[in-house]
């Protein structure tokens, strides 16, 4: 089971408060583990413009303003830009299932600051990581639902509504979602 490009949707029974009502886009998944970015938990006290200022990256008047999210509990000082696949930085952009790109170099920040770069993007500070077999065990334990990641939902500005919106997209009423696992 390769979850690359899939969304993990936290179940109501999620025991880890860091992932309560979270959506995590899995960017890489292999027998060695998995890496993903939480896409619906904005950082309240840091704007993209403020981050550019901290990094001494000048912002043009037409510079883009993308949302900054907490990508996960690992390496929170490290930044990742999740974006549409219409932007590629040679040797630096990782293509995720052909639907998304992930770039973690300063060139994408500079492009966005100039008003260029990908048509859709969000910034993530930190990432979510799993060791070998860990994410599969969590899915099996019913901590997460998995689904294909719709681009329009991933890049939506409605961060508070993304979790419920994804469940509804899957045909699930969040009020009737059971936290009890059943296995045949």
Swiss-Prot record:
Q: Which InterPro entries match?
A: AlgH-like
| Listed Pfam families | DUF179
A Gene Ontology CC term for this entry?
cytosol
Q: Name the domain of life this protein comes from.
A: Bacteria
The family note in this entry says:
Belongs to the UPF0301 (AlgH) family.
Which PANTHER family does the record cross-reference, listed alphabetically?
UNCHARACTERIZED PROTEIN YQGE (PTHR30327), UPF0301 PROTEIN YQGE (PTHR30327:SF1)
Name of the protein in question? UPF0301 protein RSKD131_2391
* Organism lineage string: Bacteria, Pseudomonadati, Pseudomonadota, Alphaproteobacteria, Rhodobacterales
């Amino acid at each position: 089971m390769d979850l690359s490009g899939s969304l993990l949707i936290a179940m109501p029974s999620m025991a880890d408060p860091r992932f309560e009502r979270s959506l995590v886009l899995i960017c890489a998944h292999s027998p060695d583990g998995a890496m993903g970015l939480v896409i619906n938990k904005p950082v309240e006290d840091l704007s993209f413009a403020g981050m550019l200022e901290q990094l001494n990256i000048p912002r043009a008047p037409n510079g883009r303003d993308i949302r900054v999210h907490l990508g996960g509990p690992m390496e929170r000082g490290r930044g990742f830009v999740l974006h549409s696949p219409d932007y590629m930085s040679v040797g630096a952009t990782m293509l995720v299932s052909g639907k998304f790109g992930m770039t973690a170099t300063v060139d994408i920040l500079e492009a966005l600051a100039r008003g260029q770069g990908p048509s859709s993007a969000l910034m993530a500070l930190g990432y979510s990581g799993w060791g070998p077999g860990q994410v599969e065990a969590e899915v099996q334990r019913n901590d997460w639902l998995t689904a294909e990641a719709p681009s329009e939902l991933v890049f939506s500005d409605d961060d508070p509504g993304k979790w419920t919106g994804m469940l509804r997209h899957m045909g699930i009423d969040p009020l009737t979602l059971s936290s009890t696992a059943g296995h045949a």
